[in-house]
């Protein structure tokens, strides 16, 4: 059986996947955990009228609250125990990474290996709980004044005000804490990045509903068929663009000087240093979405006029939303790349192994050259991320297309999917298997590339 990823020249051959018991167990474990996540997304928070809440959200089509509900797989619209999703955890991770740059103590922890990373993880967990408490309290307070379009109250709890708020805060915070633990379990015992896969699963389950809803709108003459065709073509183009950009590399040639060790000659080989065009992956849009989701999940449940006016300006496709999103994408693209790559360290390792870039002096000049190339690639990658995430939403608003599954969601789905494929491929190759992708020039080049 062979499954091909469109535009990537990679064909999955699944006969090798289940030959390795450990990989098979990891895949089954990941699927089981994601199934639990989907079950939890249907367990309601006590004291909520589901019918009234559904009617309220149906009236919020196109709002930022509706947009971020997509990342929770509909849990926010149903206000289930997983309504907050993993966004508080992502926000806490962003804060910790920023604080690592600011505070020397945290910077030292990040360089202490596994022990230091464990401490930072503990601090991130604490931060997640704090942010969850704040968001959950804001939602619980806003729910009390919410009503469906027909006037039916959303809250039907017989408890007093603070009793309902306390129960809601505990429920939503516990749900986020459980998802945080689930993500860590996937990292340790499953395959892929746990948090990314949870977001991936939340988006994917909404795809069939979005397609069916779009077809119904065409049948009822609410949108023209040509618009649906344009949306379909645009989605295909975005998928091709994401696959191309996420697999594209810039190769910096590296030459190794000849040297004698004993009676043998070493070196004299040519290789290259591969740098991804988009080295930050899908992290910038996920981080940007998380930051915008934090106030949105609170203001969306508050019916005060001026709060709703601000929330309306943060709708996908609006100028303020697009501007903030682009700024954050550029910031996190450069920030995350700076964390992942250290040009000085790369230059030192290259020099220590007798390698040099033709025409560039080893050491400081090499570090400056690599940093310059990396900066240009990151800038181009940030433009690509911003275009993929923002342009479809702007077009949907301009043509009045009620389709919330935009470029950001497609980018995350395709990016996380490619990352999962690469991790399984690496696992198979590490076990001396042929892998489950056909050999391509890209893979052959990667095998011959410089490893630092």
What are these regions (language model features)?
Residues 13, 56-63, 104-105, 251-276, ...:
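Juxtamembrane inter-helical linkers in multi-pass membrane proteins
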